[in-house]
């Protein structure tokens, strides 16, 4: 009988940059493509920046930014134009082999725990609806995210803008 996998969710460190970039680029177009300088900037803007390690190997990550960042994303700016107090899940990505095994649920639970600890009120994010990202839409619906609007992006993608209160069930 094999042992259960060892899952660790931890803060991203500078030495993780190449691996995080690799995972990010493997998930385009679900997440935007970035170069090393842009990823370094995103990490610096993210007070919650988490890596997911499975048996000692980084298989996923997420970056969460505050509502007072200078971040220039059109989706982030949609939220800042409408809300004063939120954290923005800029990107979450896993390598293909790690998807569908509950790691996203564990990662979101840790983001939620950290937000409650910090006193943050809501987590905001967007999910592609045209073309649809059905697995992501279902994942976020199960976690209590509610659509607060939609927008067409300059990249030809329509997104569902969603929010969830930190610490709420889901």
Predicted segment positions?
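Conserved acetyl-CoA-binding loop-helix of GNAT-fold acetyltransferases
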Residues: 94, 100-113, 142
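A short, internal acetyl-CoA/4′-phosphopantetheine-binding micro-motif in the GNAT/acyltransferase core
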Residues: 90-99, 129-130
């Amino acid at each position: 009988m094999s042992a259960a996998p060892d899952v660790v969710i931890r803060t991203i460190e500078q030495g993780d940059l190449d691996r995080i970039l690799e995972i990010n680029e493997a998930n385009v177009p679900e997440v935007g493509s970035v170069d090393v300088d842009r990823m370094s900037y995103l990490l610096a803007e993210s007070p919650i920046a988490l890596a997911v390690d499975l048996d000692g190997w980084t298989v996923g990550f997420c970056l969460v930014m505050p509502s007072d960042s200078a971040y220039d994303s059109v989706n982030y700016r949609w939220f800042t134009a409408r809300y004063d107090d939120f954290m923005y899940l800029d990107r979450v990505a896993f390598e293909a082999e790690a998807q569908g095994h509950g790691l996203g649920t564990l990662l979101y639970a840790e983001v939620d725990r950290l937000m409650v600890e910090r006193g943050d009120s809501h987590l905001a994010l967007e999910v592609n609806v045209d073309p649809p990202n059905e697995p992501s839409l279902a994942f976020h619906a199960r976690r209590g995210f509610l659509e607060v609007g939609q927008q067409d992006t300059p990249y030809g993608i329509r997104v569902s803008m969603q929010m969830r209160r930190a610490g709420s069930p889901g």
